[in-house]
């Protein structure tokens, strides 16, 4: 039977606990440093608390140490890895191969000492930042000892299935929901080039969410100030079973910068969908953690932050994967503007509105405008200020549902582990057994004068304040003893304590057994040059930012893009000359293709282009970026100019 894992984001401890409470089998969270979201750092103490809470439900905690690291940060990284291991984390997500060497070569004292007494170290997961889009790359990572690989978001279900067929022993983690990067992860240098903020260092400036003109070689403007690289949000909620059949083990929700209401709603929605799949195939799949959730709301993905939804490339190239009008959340469709007055208007539709709702629309200039509802009288809405550009017939969306947010602001889920207890007499007292754990008390046996079964069940079922709920108490058919309620309470509390201790011990062994790892694997390794991944002759695409990683790859010096830019060398002397191939650097590799989006991809049945190559993206400040349409690999590449 294969376990299916719902993996949720945790901006902080509060979000992590909410994710567990709403059905997550695992959460991923960033520490103070070296996580791919600078704005989502957490103390090791908070991570320790999250591990303790999650492990009650056999849920796991993964920590992102998935940025590239500079030489002067290696010692701090070692210390962090030691602290995370001591905190009880279950896995580390890695991009920089220097981290791999530290964890597997015994460079981290606490990791080694933990392995000595429990025989395990945290699992290694290859972050999507390692650009995992081919069978060859996943095989290479498996050979290095990675237990799991986070696949590129761009892969189709057929590509995922092929990777699983070729590398069946590696767990495959796939993104199923949330924001999409337009470039293959780990291969985007636009933010660093434009603003000195590295995406590979967790400081992406989101160039892909900016407005561009699209111009041809003659300067003819094909598009004016549109969000041409801004993708919609991923939503694979209807395709989880298909992904499981393809070999996916972990279903990942993006959103380590999202708030707690987002986490609650999205996790609950996906948890319910996974449960329905397991109910359909009870002999094939099971959840990766324990417990079931009871919600006080009905999950609805349309009511949470989204830029519109797409399945991206799950079933091949699709025409409607980006949102050129806005990079912001539009929310759910609620109707169209009907009759307008000076301070109000009617909405044609069936949606119910509440005071304080946030609504938005796309105006005639293709810009998103929003406003707040001050008062709702049925379908007549009175905005705080009447939008000047609102017109009859315009489509309305709700990006903030006040009633729904009020539900989520309260306790919105309870997660419990159902247990069946067995109470039995022993020679000198009684035993209470459940889930493989037995508690005992010593006392004299007293025959009951009247039936005690109902009272016994009532007393043993008082599990409030614990993660457990009693689904039944079994006793021998001839059980007819009187046990004082105080002794039953002691027996119940003893079992809870023993089971909790056992769960913590069990979850200390979520890592890899050290003696199963071949430490000789961690040597100089040549990353595969797969024909399906062009441009690897650019040395910076390996993201080698320190000498430990350079030694791993068998090169003399670090070659990371970040090391060749003025922002890195500021205060450190003169920056070296660009170490590329004597041409403008490649900044993005995208499966999203503007030529296809405009209907000019002949390969996919489009019309023959009428513009002159090359095409350029142009920011509002005049900076240009040359586009290359690599039809052989069905990929659009973006170069600096």
Predicted feature residues:
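Aromatic- and glycine-enriched glycan-recognition loops and surfaces
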Residues: 39-48
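Surface-exposed amphipathic alpha-helical tracts and adjacent flexible/coil segments at the periphery
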Residues: 1-22, 26-36, 50-51, 57-85, ...
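Well-ordered mid-protein domain cores that form the structural environment of catalytic cofactors
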Residues: 78-107, 119-139
């Amino acid at each position: 039977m294969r376990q299916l894992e719902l993996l949720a984001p945790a901006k902080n401890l509060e979000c992590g606990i909410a994710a567990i409470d709403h059905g997550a089998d695992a959460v991923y969270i960033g520490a103070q440093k070296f996580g791919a979201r600078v704005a989502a750092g957490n103390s090791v103490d908070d991570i320790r608390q999250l591990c303790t809470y999650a492990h009650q439900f056999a849920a796991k905690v993964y920590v992102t140490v998935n940025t590239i690291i500079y030489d002067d940060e290696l010692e701090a990284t070692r210390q962090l890895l030691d602290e995370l291991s001591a905190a009880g984390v279950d896995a580390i997500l890695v991009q920089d191969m220097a981290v791999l060497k530290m964890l597997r070569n015994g460079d981290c004292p606490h990791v080694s000492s933990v392995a000595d007494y429990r025989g395990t170290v945290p699992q290694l997961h290859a972050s999507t930042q390692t650009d995992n889009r081919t069978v060859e790359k996943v095989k290479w990572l498996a050979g290095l000892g990675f237990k799991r690989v986070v696949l590129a978001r761009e892969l189709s279900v057929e590509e995922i299935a092929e990777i699983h067929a070729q590398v069946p022993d590696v767990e495959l983690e796939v993104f199923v929901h949330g924001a999409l990067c337009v470039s293959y992860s780990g291969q985007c240098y636009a933010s660093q080039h434009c603003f000195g903020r590295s995406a590979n260092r967790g400081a992406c400036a989101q160039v892909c969410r900016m407005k561009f003109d699209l111009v041809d070689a003659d300067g003819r403007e094909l598009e004016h100030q549109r969000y041409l690289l801004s993708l919609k949000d991923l939503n694979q909620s209807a395709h989880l079973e298909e992904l499981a059949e393809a070999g996916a083990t972990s279903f990942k929700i993006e959103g380590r910068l999202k708030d707690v209401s987002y986490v609650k709603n999205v996790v609950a929605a996906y948890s319910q969908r996974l449960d329905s799949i397991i109910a359909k195939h009870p002999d094939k799949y099971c959840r990766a953690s324990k417990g079931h959730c009871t919600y006080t709301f009905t999950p609805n993905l349309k009511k949470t932050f989204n830029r519109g939804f797409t399945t991206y490339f799950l079933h091949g190239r699709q025409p409607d994967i980006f949102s050129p009008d806005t990079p912001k959340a539009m929310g759910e469709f609620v109707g169209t503007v009907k009759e307008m007055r000076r301070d109000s208007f009617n909405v044609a539709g069936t949606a119910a509105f509440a005071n304080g709702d946030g609504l938005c629309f796309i105006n005639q200039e293709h810009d998103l405008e929003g406003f707040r509802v001050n008062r709702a009288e049925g379908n007549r809405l009175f905005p705080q200020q009447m939008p000047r550009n609102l017109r009859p017939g315009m489509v309305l969306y709700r990006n903030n549902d006040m009633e729904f947010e009020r539900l989520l602001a309260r306790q919105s889920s309870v997660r419990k582990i159902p247990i069946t207890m067995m109470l039995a007499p022993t020679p000198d007292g009684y035993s209470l057994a459940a889930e493989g754990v037995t508690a005992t008390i010593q006392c004299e046996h007293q025959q009951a004068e009247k039936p005690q079964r109902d009272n016994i069940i009532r007393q043993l079922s008082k599990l409030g304040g614990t993660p457990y709920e009693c689904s039944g108490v079994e006793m021998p058919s001839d059980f007819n003893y009187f046990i004082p309620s105080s002794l039953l309470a002691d027996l119940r509390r003893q079992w809870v304590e023993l089971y909790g201790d056992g769960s913590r011990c069990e979850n200390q062994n979520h890592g890899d057994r050290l003696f199963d790892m071949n430490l000789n694997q961690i040597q100089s390794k040549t990353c595969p040059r797969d024909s399906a991944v062009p441009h690897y002759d650019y040395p910076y695409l390996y993201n080698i930012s320190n000498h430990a990683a350079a030694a791993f790859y068998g090169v003399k010096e670090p070659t990371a893009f970040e090391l060749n830019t003025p922002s890195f060398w500021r205060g450190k002397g003169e920056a070296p000359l660009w170490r590329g191939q004597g041409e403008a650097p490649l900044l993005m590799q995208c499966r999203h293709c503007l030529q296809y989006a405009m209907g000019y991809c002949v390969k996919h049945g489009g019309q023959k282009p009428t513009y002159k190559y090359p095409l350029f993206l142009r920011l509002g400040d005049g900076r240009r970026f040359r586009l290359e349409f690599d039809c052989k690999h069905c990929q659009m590449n973006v170069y600096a100019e």
